A protein has these predicted regions:
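Charged DNA-binding/catalytic regions of mobile-element recombinases
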Residues: 1-298
Length: 298
């Protein structure tokens, strides 16, 4: 309760002047506050309506934070009806609505000093001017309640952050990353001329994977040994996936649930989930609008 509200609540029983002296506020300030009451009521009603919209968006996956919820609210809105991110943040705090936060990850990169190494062609610059030019990939573990793990291999396009290819299995042998890169080839039609960047895990330095890359026309690139920042884009994707699917839990109840939830999430990631890199657009939408812009310019 504010001091002004205290005065308002007791002014029928006591003199306003005396109440203002007790709570140490000026009478003019109290009357100004009182005159603004209708405007405050209008703002409170608008905030309540906005809170309902925010909760409806958040409840779709219980993972979205202020930036993506703000983008969702403003998507297609009239310029005069756009919502400021600070207002969204304030209402989310008041309503105790929050996105999910990162958790620590288990190390899955095990370098094999006996295998080949290749240079770092990206130098931590994961951007690309067009789709299908630069890809990054990694393997991450997916914990299951019985103590086992599934493993997910990813191929992410640096232009749009689209997950172009992925594979999931009970092992992290070289076949897993070969399947993921093949899935990306199927998505794009061809990977000829593209760069694929990874860490120095034994799977990525294997002869079998090198031969598969050559067969697809892909040039390999690798970051420094033991430096996660050299593959930060893939690491960030893995952390986001587990944060938004496990939602604070430690493991999936079984393999079937794990596979189903990961499939649902990666589908939503590409088609519906707003990405800050893409100007708060989903990756596929970002690519489509880029292609449309090029056609108009031609």
């Amino acid at each position: 309760m504010t001091r002004f509200q205290f005065v308002a609540d007791h002014r029928d029983a006591f003199e306003v002047k005396r109440l203002c002296e007790i709570v140490d506020v000026a009478r003019s300030s109290f009357y100004a506050w009182l005159a603004a009451a209708p405007a405050r009521a209008v703002r409170a009603s608008a905030d309540a309506a906005l809170a309902q919209r925010i909760r409806a968006i958040h409840d779709t996956d219980c993972a979205q934070g202020v930036p993506r919820i703000t983008a969702e609210l403003n998507d297609g809105a009239d310029p005069t009806a756009r919502v400021n991110h600070k207002r969204v943040a304030r209402i989310m705090r008041q309503e105790q609505i929050a996105g999910l936060r990162l958790r620590r990850r288990l190390r899955t990169t095990v370098p094999d000093p006996a295998e080949q190494t290749v240079p770092d062609l990206l130098g931590r610059d994961f951007t690309a001017e067009e789709p299908n030019q630069r890809y990054v990939g990694d393997i991450t573990y997916l914990p299951v309640a019985d103590g086992t793990n599934l493993y997910l291999a990813t191929v992410i396009d640096g232009f749009s952050r689209r997950l172009a290819g992925w594979a999931i299995a009970e092992h992290m042998r070289t076949d897993l990353i070969i399947d993921a890169l093949s899935a990306a080839r199927d998505t794009r039609g061809s990977l000829a001329g593209a760069i694929f960047h990874s860490d120095h895990g034994a799977q990525y330095t294997s002869r079998a994977f090198a031969e598969h890359c050559r067969a697809l026309g892909v040039t390999q690139s690798m970051g420094s040994v033991g430096t996660s920042a050299d593959n930060a884009l893939a690491e960030s994707f893995n952390a986001t996936l587990k944060r938004e699917t496990l939602r604070g839990g430690h493991a999936w109840p079984n393999e079937h649930t794990c596979r189903r939830e990961v499939f649902r999430w990666v589908t939503r990631y590409n088609t519906r989930r707003r990405h800050s890199w893409c100007g708060q657009q989903p990756p596929i939408t970002y690519e489509q609008r880029h292609a449309a812009t090029l056609q108009l310019a031609a």
